[in-house]
């Protein structure tokens, strides 16, 4: 093996272990967020049984479904990390070369900005093509609120993928794909814009204290997450449609989903669970710290 291959393998392993630990640690927050996002589109949660908010959700889940149910869908989330990272590594430089080759970020800012969005969107869409079914299964398993095996819609990851494929074909595993790609581009635009502005306001960006850099990264991640959150809500709602027939289908398509959520639930509905998403983002910062520590050991 070449030195570059060994270095990649070490990074891949350290990143995977760090991601598995952090994703498992924040899985309960992630499940609360998903339930608040999709409960309106769930066949299992009656209107009078819907969760009133984050605290109500945290209190009721262990009572109604057991403590371990906080980690429903976490395995799919952990597995998803490895192909995503490998694909990002494979495509990232290629897309940067295509969209940003020969562009000077100092003299051609807007071209650099557009190229960054295009390369990020293209890399994200390419990775999503391969890992989207895992993201889909993660959402459906987290939204499954039955306590016993007989009450639950799916027995596990494999059962979820097989049942939906039998019912709707491969297409069923890709519900909400288009809006997911749009969300990636919006997230990158917000992240890139806010981060660039924040860094530009610092007196000496290159010699910024690590705590200040961490706080900026946290703030930027939170702001970008809130900006792109409605797209995440719509895609999760679309995921809930797979496996349904006739009158059970709530939305005719993505545009109809946007319209109905706004009309029936109001603009606030697009941001259900957004606060728990911000808390989960702190777990992302933990990953970076953990990743650096693991690299020292491996």
UniProtKB/Swiss-Prot annotation:
Modification sites for N6,N6,N6-trimethyllysine: 52
Modified residues (N-acetylthreonine): 2
Catalysed reactions listed for this entry: ADP(in) + ATP(out) = ADP(out) + ATP(in); H(+)(in) = H(+)(out)
Primary localization: mitochondrion
Membrane topology note: Multi-pass membrane protein
Regions crossing the membrane: 8-37, 75-99, 110-130, 179-199, 211-231, 274-291
Keyword Repeat: yes
Regulation: The matrix-open state (m-state) is inhibited by the membrane-permeable bongkrekic acid (BKA). The cytoplasmic-open state (c-state) is inhibited by the membrane-impermeable toxic inhibitor carboxyatractyloside (CATR). Proton transporter activity is inhibited by ADP:ATP antiporter activity.
Post-translational modification: Trimethylated by ANTKMT at Lys-52.
Short sequence motif Nucleotide carrier signature motif: positions: 235-240
Entry keywords, A to Z: Acetylation, Antiport, Apoptosis, Membrane, Methylation, Mitochondrion, Mitochondrion inner membrane, Repeat, Transmembrane, Transmembrane helix, Transport
GO molecular function, one term: ATP:ADP antiporter activity
Record SUPFAM superfamilies: Mitochondrial carrier
PTM-bearing positions, type N6-acetyllysine: 105, 268
Gene3D superfamilies (alphabetical): Mitochondrial carrier domain (1.50.40.10)
Protein purpose: ADP:ATP antiporter that mediates import of ADP into the mitochondrial matrix for ATP synthesis, and export of ATP out to fuel the cell. Cycles between the cytoplasmic-open state (c-state) and the matrix-open state (m-state): operates by the alternating access mechanism with a single substrate-binding site intermittently exposed to either the cytosolic (c-state) or matrix (m-state) side of the inner mitochondrial membrane. In addition to its ADP:ATP antiporter activity, also involved in mitochondrial uncoupling and mitochondrial permeability transition pore (mPTP) activity.
Record-stated family: Belongs to the mitochondrial carrier (TC 2.A.29) family.
Protein's name according to its UniProt entry: ADP/ATP translocase 3
Organism name: Sus scrofa
């Amino acid at each position: 093996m070449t030195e570059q291959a060994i270095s990649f393998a070490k990074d891949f392993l350290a990143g995977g272990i760090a991601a598995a630990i952090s994703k498992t640690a924040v899985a309960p927050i992630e499940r609360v967020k998903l339930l608040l996002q999709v409960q309106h589109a769930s066949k299992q949660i009656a209107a009078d049984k819907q969760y009133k908010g984050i605290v109500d959700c945290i209190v009721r889940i262990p009572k109604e479904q057991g403590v371990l149910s906080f980690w429903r869908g976490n395995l799919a989330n952990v597995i998803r990390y490895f192909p995503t990272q490998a694909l990002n590594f494979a495509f990232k430089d290629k897309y940067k070369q295509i969209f940003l080759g020969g562009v000077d970020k100092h003299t051609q800012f807007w071209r650099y900005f557009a190229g960054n969005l295009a390369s990020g969107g293209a890399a994200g869409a390419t990775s999503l093509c391969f890992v989207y079914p895992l993201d889909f299964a993660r959402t459906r398993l987290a939204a499954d609120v039955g306590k016993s095996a007989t009450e639950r819609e799916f027995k596990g990851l494999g059962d979820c993928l097989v049942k939906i494929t039998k019912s709707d074909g491969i297409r069923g595993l890709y519900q909400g794909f288009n809006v997911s790609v749009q969300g990636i581009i919006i997230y990158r635009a917000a992240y890139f814009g806010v981060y660039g502005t924040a860094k530009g306001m610092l007196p000496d960006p290159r010699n910024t204290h690590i705590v200040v850099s961490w706080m900026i990264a946290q703030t930027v991640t939170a702001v970008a997450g809130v900006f792109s959150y409605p797209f995440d809500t719509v895609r999760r709602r679309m995921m809930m449609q797979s496996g349904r027939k006739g009158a059970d289908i709530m939305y005719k398509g993505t545009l109809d989903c946007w319209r109905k959520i706004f009309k029936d639930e109001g603009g606030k509905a697009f941001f259900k669970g957004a606060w728990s998403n911000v808390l989960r983002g702190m777990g992302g910062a933990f990953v970076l710290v953990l990743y650096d520590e693991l690299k020292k050991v491996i």
